């Protein structure tokens, strides 16, 4: 309260106090692609991160076997094509996150749009990986968009989730060069390697509290 009164209120700032002996609790959301999930779990099991992973959440059964390999509970809520049960699903997900005391969420190629309610519950605490060098090629199939446009590099971007699709504060980016010999399929393969690296870097920085967000941008402390 003293710090809040002395500094935060005066400068219209927000601050958080964390203790090193309390591990952040990270929930992972996935759909059908396994490359980012495997990379995150391998780093977790190798002890690279001071973090707990109490649950993996999905809208498909496809990756349950991965969760079982790492002995992490896997929860599935299927979403109808017309999204008529989307609100109900997110309520159930939010109850799980609260029960498991989740402090931040990683979207490891989770192919669903996060609602405003969940974003408000976890402001600047939902990390997404987008398979393009934002702000270029937002939305679906960015590698195919890049190939059709004839670009010479492709990239991946990890960012915090906001209400505007693929437009949140950027945490980490990287690129790789491509040539006329590449196909959409080869771009996807090259992109998957980038996605794993970029997402893991972003998660590392978040866990280490090295990110300051300001006006939809980030300041990264080394």
List each model region and its residues.
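A conserved regulatory-domain signal marking ACT and ACT-like small-molecule sensing domains
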Residues: 1-22
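Residues that mark the start of a beta-strand
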Residues: 23-26, 125
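Short, glycine-rich nucleotide/cofactor-binding loops
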Residues: 27-35
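Histidine-anchored nucleotide/phosphate-binding helix
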Residues: 35-46
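A short alpha->loop->secondary-structure connector
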Residues: 44-53, 71
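Short internal beta-strands
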Residues: 51-62
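Donor/substrate-binding cores of folate-linked one-carbon enzymes
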Residues: 59-60, 84-88, 100-222
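Adenosine-nucleotide cofactor-binding segment
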Residues: 68, 72-100
């Amino acid at each position: 309260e003293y710090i809040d009164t002395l500094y935060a209120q005066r400068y219209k700032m927000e601050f958080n106090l964390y203790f090193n002996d309390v591990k952040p609790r990270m929930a992972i959301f996935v759909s059908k692609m396994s490359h980012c999930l495997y990379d995150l779990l391998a780093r977790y099991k190798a002890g690279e991160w001071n973090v707990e992973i109490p649950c993996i959440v999905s809208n498909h059964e496809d990756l349950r076997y991965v969760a079982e390999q790492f002995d992490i509970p896997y929860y599935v809520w299927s979403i109808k094509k017309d999204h008529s049960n989307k609100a109900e699903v997110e309520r159930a997900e939010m109850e799980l996150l609260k029960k498991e005391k989740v402090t931040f969420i990683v979207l490891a190629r989770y192919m669903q749009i996060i609602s405003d309610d969940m974003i408000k519950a976890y402001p600047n605490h939902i990390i997404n990986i987008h398979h393009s060098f934002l702000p270029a090629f937002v939305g679906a199939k960015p590698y195919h968009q890049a190939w059709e446009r004839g670009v010479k590099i492709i990239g991946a971007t990890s960012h915090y989730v906001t209400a505007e699709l693929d437009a949140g504060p950027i945490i980490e980016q990287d690129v790789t060069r491509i040539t006329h010999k590449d196909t959409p399929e080869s771009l996807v393969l090259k992109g998957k390697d980038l996605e794993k690296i970029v997402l893991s870097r972003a998660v590392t920085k978040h866990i280490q509290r090295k990110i300051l967000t300001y006006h939809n941008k980030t300041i990264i402390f080394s």
